[in-house]
Amino acid sequence: SASRKMRIFSSVVCRLPFIVWVPFYRPQTDAASGSILGGHLTSNLAGSFARHGKRTLLIDCDLRRPMMHRHFKQQNTTGLITWFENGANVEGNLPEDPTLGIIQVGEGLSLLCSGGRSKSPTEILESKAFADLLSRLKRFYDLVVVDSPPLGAVTDSLLIAQRTDEVIYVCRFNRAYKKHIRLYVKALRSGCNEVLGIVLNGLTPRRIEYYSDYRYYRSYKKYYGSQS
C-alpha cells in the first residue's frame, strides 16, 4: 500500500548532509525503464526527507535521459546544462540564480532540473565547477538528493558518486545478479566516501516472510555459499 511504502522510505531518513541515489542496471534490461524506475524512487525519497522537516533539494543529474521534470510536471528549459553553458557561477544566492532555475515543487522540497539533454555530459560531471556547485548548495539545504543514470549503463553515476558524501545503491528484487552487485558496489566504494547501504526494491511482505523462514535460509545459504 501507499502508506506502507512511505513508512519504508521514512525509515531511510537519517542525518546525512548529502546523498546520491543509484538505481540498479541490468544489461539485459532496457536502460530507459531502469531510469524511470530510479526516478520514482528518488523523488519518493526526496519527498520523504521534506516531510520530515528537512529542506531538501532534488537534482536531476541524468543528463542523457532526464525524467525528474516529468515527475513534477515542470519544464526542463533551465538547469545544470544551462548553468554550465552560462559560465557555471557558484557565487551568490544559488536558489535564486536564473541560470540554475531551481523550482519549489512542494513544502520544503525544491528541484534542480537537468536543463535539457547532453550526449556527452562527462565534461560537466567531472568538472571542478560541478563539484563546487554541489559543495555550495549544501549551505542552502539540509539534504541534497541526486538522481543519477542507471549504474552500469554509463560511467556518469561513478563520476557523480565521487562528488558525494553517501551512496544508496538500489537493486530490484529478482532482477539483479549477485556478481554484478558485488562489482558495482566495489566500484562505488573505490570512487566515493561511503556506500551507506543497498536497498532491495520490489520485495513484497509475502516474499519477505518466505525468505525469513529458517529452512529456506539454510537452503539459500547452502546454494549461494558456494558462489561466494
Task: Locate predicted features.
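P-loop NTP-binding module
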Residues: 1-228
